């Protein structure tokens, strides 16, 4: 079974073609800078990698270029020969609890959710609409970042606001990065040789966008992101948790408009807001006070969530780091786990420095892992499961 996975961004398309159930990657194409003067196309196939430029004005043209590349290398003749096309969609709201076959109703609901994730859902929908035009006869499946958190109990997803706001307007915690958290859960269960449905763990997806997740018996029971991906951890350009009254103060006392506040919290806060740099690798290299403070704020926030989730779960079998920072920064992992020995977490510093899969000591009561998350593969697995159901 050949399943294509499409992750459509505002100016990019990530395309991976899998042979399932073997989970073999047949091709990987990344189209960047759509709509700009010169677009970049990166193509990987077996051991080959090619990078070339072309002017691509729209997502429709982007998919046509991908199709042309796959045809040229005799991987597939046309998208219509695929068994399925699976799309990443960031926000599924209250509507979607699992992977879903796309129809007119699904498209309508994804469009309805754009205000809750304007940066992502609009672009995700664009990829779906273009793909449907290219291959109308191929089953197309939406896999949602919010679905893994559909198991949150009411006390976790409700905000302490008037209940009518939830009933009438669905203002609640949804959580994000669910595709990544789900994949990491499966990999840790394999590493520990345990049934994932009996596993209690904390997953830490740390990248430019970051979130923590508390998992009990293989189900998400709490997560740091909320109604939108703005809540929770200190991120590259997002504030994470702040006193909500700050938003009112910015508008009433400092004269900020609504759009300016949204821009401030999403694009000019977090690490870049504190020290002027978004790249954590550069922040670690720096020797100025604000860079040190930004790093300490970021790791301190993660540590606080670990403590809260340990108290919530009672028994914790494992902690797992993933995504760009979580997978690659031994310094960040060490700062986060420092002085947690009292809680049964013992870091093996040598294993951590080598970015090994398991980075806890043999004597550690809680095992600690570094997992290379693979959201595209998880999407393909969920799509395959839906098709075979």
UniProtKB/Swiss-Prot annotation:
ATP binds at residues 14, 205-209, 279-281, 324-328. Pfam families: Acetate_kinase. It catalyses: acetate + ATP = acetyl phosphate + ADP. Substrate binds at residue 88. Signal peptide: none annotated. It is found in: Cytoplasm. CDD domains: ASKHA_NBD_AcK_PK. Mg(2+) binds at residues 7, 375. The record marks 177, 238 as: Transition state stabilizer. Catalyzes the formation of acetyl phosphate from acetate and ATP. Can also catalyze the reverse reaction. Belongs to the acetokinase family. Homodimer. This is Acetate kinase. It comes from Sulfurimonas denitrificans (strain ATCC 33889 / DSM 1251) (Thiomicrospira denitrificans (strain ATCC 33889 / DSM 1251)).
């Amino acid at each position: 079974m050949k399943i294509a996975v499409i992750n459509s961004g505002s100016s990019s398309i990530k395309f991976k073609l899998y042979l399932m159930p073997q989970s073999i990657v047949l091709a990987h194409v990344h189209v960047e800078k759509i709509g700009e003067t010169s677009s970049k196309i990166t193509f990987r196939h077996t051991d080959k990698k090619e990078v070339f430029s072309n002017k691509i004005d729209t997502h429709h043209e982007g998919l046509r270029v991908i199709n042309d590349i796959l045809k040229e290398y005799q991987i597939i003749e046309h998208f219509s020969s695929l068994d399925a096309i699976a799309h990443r969609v960031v926000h599924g709201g209250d509507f979607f609890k699992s992977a879903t076959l796309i129809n007119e109703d699904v498209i309508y609901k994804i469009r309805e959710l754009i205000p809750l994730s304007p940066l992502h859902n609009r672009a995700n929908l664009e990829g779906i609409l273009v793909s449907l035009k290219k291959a109308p006869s191929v089953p197309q499946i939406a896999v949602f970042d919010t679905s893994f958190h559909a198991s949150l109990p009411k006390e976790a997803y409700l905000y302490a606001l008037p209940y009518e706001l939830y009933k009438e307007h669905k203002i609640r915690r949804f959580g994000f990065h669910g595709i990544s958290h789900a994949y990491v859960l499966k990999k840790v269960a394999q590493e520990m040789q345990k049934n994932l449905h009996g596993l209690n763990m904390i997953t830490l997806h740390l990248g430019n966008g970051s979130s923590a997740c508390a998992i009990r018996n293989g189900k998400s029971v709490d997560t740091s992101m909320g109604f939108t991906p703005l809540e929770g951890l200190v991120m590259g350009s997002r504030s994470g948790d702040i006193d909500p009254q700050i938003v009112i103060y910015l508008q009433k006392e400092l004269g900020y408009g609504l759009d300016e506040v949204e821009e401030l919290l999403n694009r000019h806060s977090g690490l870049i807001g504190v020290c002027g740099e978004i790249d954590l690798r550069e922040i670690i290299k720096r020797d100025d006070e604000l860079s040190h403070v930004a790093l300490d704020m970021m790791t301190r926030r993660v540590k606080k969530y670990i403590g809260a989730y340990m108290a919530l779960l009672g028994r914790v079998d494992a902690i797992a780091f993933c995504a760009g920072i979580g997978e690659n920064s031994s310094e960040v992992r060490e700062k986060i786990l420092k002085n947690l020995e009292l809680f049964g977490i013992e870091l093996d510093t040598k294993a951590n420095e080598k970015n090994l899969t398991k980075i806890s000591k043999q004597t550690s009561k809680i095992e600690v892992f570094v997992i290379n998350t693979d959201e595209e593969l998880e999407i393909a697995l969920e799509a395959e499961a839906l098709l075979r159901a």
